[in-house]
Regions:
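Substrate-binding pocket helix/loop in short-chain dehydrogenase/reductase
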Residues: 97-98, 102-107
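Conserved glycine-rich cofactor-binding loop
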Residues: 9, 16-17
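The beta1-alpha1 cofactor-binding region of Rossmann-like NAD(H)/NADP(H)-dependent oxidoreductases
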Residues: 60-71, 103
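Residue(s) in the substrate-gating loop at a strand-loop-helix junction
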Residues: 140
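SDR active-site lid
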Residues: 173-237
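Conserved glycine-rich Rossmann-like NAD(P)H-binding loop of the short-chain dehydrogenase/reductase
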Residues: 30-47
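Active-site helix of classical SDR
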Residues: 121, 156
Length: 269
């Protein structure tokens, strides 16, 4: 990778683990200055201890709270003076049939996945405009094709992509690059922490994490997509097929998706 990220100030939400942590691990050797946030003080402290001699700024933040997002962005600006790239990575998933799920599941998922991105982008936007910077949303194939058992998650990703497309158009003349990335199934904690029907962490993954793309590989794809100024990037071949089939043959896509997630009438994935 070129010197594109050298001395760039990159703000990443949800950087204490998973894809966010992998992005930090990849960006630090490239000479980027990084600000990140997460809900866990301990995880952020461990991250800070891992990188004691680099430009890494961490802030305990719950992105579902607008004031927390404002403080994270302001703290980043106070520390580095500006923001070149904002990666809205923080996210939460869910696993429950709609008929069983409490409506609080929808509120919590939307608050993190959609409104967290809106809040951080809103407060970072003046700096991003002045720097002709980059806004990135970490989305999912669920932003193209609604997934059973993930209705709230799918809704949040459809909302994210629609909003990003709208502001991309608004910001065209201001030279701010807006994009989203759909990683596909990536080995991380997101399925363990996914909300159940009662809006509580389900505590275990229902899928084989070892067969998935690694967070490090995902981060590499994301950074290359940013450098190439892509409008969007779907990272796995399977997800590219899903998007294409859903666009061209939606009824067939319904059946294929149902058969993947259900066995014997029960949600198994």
């Amino acid at each position: 990778m070129s010197s594109f990220f050298t001395n760039k100030v990159v703000a990443i939400t949800g950087g204490s683990e998973g894809i966010g942590k992998a992005l930090i691990d990849a960006l630090i050797p490239l000479g980027a200055k990084i600000a990140t946030c997460g809900r866990s003080f301990d995880k952020l402290y461990n991250l800070q201890m891992q990188y004691t001699n680099v430009m890494l700024h961490t802030v305990v933040t719950d992105v579902s709270k607008e004031e927390d997002c404002r403080k994270f962005i302001q703290s980043t600006l106070d520390t580095f003076g500006h923001i070149d790239i904002l990666i809205n990575n923080a996210g939460v998933s869910m696993r429950a049939l709609f008929e069983d799920a409490d409506t609080d599941v929808f509120r919590k998922v939307m608050d993190v996945n959609f409104f967290g991105s809106v809040y951080c982008t809103k407060y970072a936007l003046p700096s991003l405009i002045s720097r002709q910077g980059v806004i990135v949303g970490i989305s999912s194939v669920a932003g193209y094709r609604g997934l059973p058992g993930r209705s709230a998650y799918s809704a949040s990703k459809f909302a994210l992509q629609g909003w990003l497309e709208a502001i991309r158009t608004e910001l065209l003349e201001k030279q701010v690059h807006v994009m989203w990335v759909s990683p596909g199934f990536t080995a991380s904690n997101i399925r363990v922490a996914a909300l159940d029907a009662n809006a509580q962490s389900q505590g275990a993954s229902t899928m084989d994490e070892t067969a998935m793309m690694s967070a490090a590989e995902c981060a590499d794809h994301i950074l290359r997509a940013i450098e190439k100024r892509k409008r969007s990037a779907v990272l796995t071949l399977n997800d590219k097929r899903t998007v294409l089939v859903n666009r061209l043959f939606p009824s067939w896509a319904d059946k294929l998706t149902h058969n993947f997630f259900f066995k014997g009438g029960k949600l198994v994935k």
